[in-house]
């Protein structure tokens, strides 16, 4: 569990570091399917061997099959997960312009059940919030994020999602306030449940919000605090390197990229080097949903 959480945190931090200047990044909910490790291989194989019409027909048959199972066993999680995956696959076949709220709604239904049946797995609730946000139900999305944060105030996925939602509503101060409150309570929360709030991760997220608002001095200060808190953690080093690079301070940025690569586990070194070579991303409007690397297993 710790390794899975850490990998997700690293991926998010790298994404935030690269995209800090456009706010919190967005991948529509169909991207959650497209990045599901357990389904990538099967999907590639299916797409390579079946024409689109045949593939759609096969997926529709799967949906009907899972629905029949759920009529008999409404809380059968294997069927719920299968139904969710099949519907996401059908959704992924559509162009973005073709996706209608009704297409997202059929994904929301199994997600609501899975979130209720697995309150300890915030991934389902985050996906649910993301889906609701995409159909314009911002209040429903906010409620889903708040429900997670009420029991897991340090959940980075929920924090990232809530921050993205607030920024999409032109409420950066509310996003900053949420993160600052999380940090102010981190010591107490971690005393009760050690490790439940990743303080450095929250600081990096806070810095990215400041950076998205072009408050570079504040962002740099937060990153420095994170680096001071844990000098061996490469995440704030990467984030500050991207901040410097965005401001045209390439020489200083290179030093930090090199430091981050030296600190990072082997599996992340190439990603950091690639981030160091990528051209700075210009400012643009913040989109309304969080990135998500994979659906829950």
Residue ranges of each PLM-predicted region?
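N-terminal leader/linker segments that initiate helical-solenoid repeat arrays
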Residues: 1-102
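Canonical tetratricopeptide repeat
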Residues: 82, 127, 161, 205, ...
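Canonical positions in the second alpha-helix
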Residues: 69, 113-114, 147-148, 181-182, ...
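Terminal, low-structured helical/coil segments at or just beyond the last alpha-helical repeat
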Residues: 2-23, 32-39, 190-193, 197-200, ...
């Amino acid at each position: 569990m710790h390794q899975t959480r850490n990998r997700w945190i690293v991926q998010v931090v790298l994404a935030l570091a690269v995209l800090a200047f456009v706010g919190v990044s967005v991948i529509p909910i169909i991207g959650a399917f497209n990045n599901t490790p357990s389904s990538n291989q099967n999907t590639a194989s299916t797409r390579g061997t079946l024409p689109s019409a045949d593939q759609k027909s096969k997926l529709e048959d799967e949906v009907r099959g899972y629905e029949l199972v759920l009529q008999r066993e409404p809380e059968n999680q294997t069927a719920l997960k299968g139904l969710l995956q099949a519907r996401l696959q059908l959704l992924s076949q559509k162009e973005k312009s073709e996706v209608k709220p009704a297409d997202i709604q059929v994904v929301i239904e199994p997600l609501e059940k899975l979130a209720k049946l697995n309150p300890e797995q915030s991934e389902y609730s985050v996906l649910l919030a993301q889906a609701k946000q995409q159909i314009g139900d911002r209040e429903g999305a906010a409620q889903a994020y708040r429900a997670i944060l009420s029991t897991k105030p340090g959940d980075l996925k929920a924090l990232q999602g809530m921050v993205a939602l607030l920024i999409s509503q032109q409420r950066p101060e509310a996003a900053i306030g949420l993160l600052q409150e999380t940090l102010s309570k981190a010591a107490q929360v971690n005393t009760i449940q050690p490790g439940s709030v990743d303080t450095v991760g929250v600081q990096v997220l806070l810095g990215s919000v400041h950076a998205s608002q072009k408050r570079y001095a504040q962002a740099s200060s937060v990153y420095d605090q994170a680096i001071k808190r844990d000098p061996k953690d490469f995440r704030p080093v990467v984030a500050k390197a991207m901040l410097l690079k965005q401001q045209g301070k390439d020489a200083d940025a290179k030093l930090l990229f090199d430091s981050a690569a030296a600190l990072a586990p082997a599996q992340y070194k190439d990603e950091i080097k690639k981030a160091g070579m990528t051209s700075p991303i210009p400012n643009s409007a913040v989109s309304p949903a969080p990135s998500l690397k994979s659906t829950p297993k």
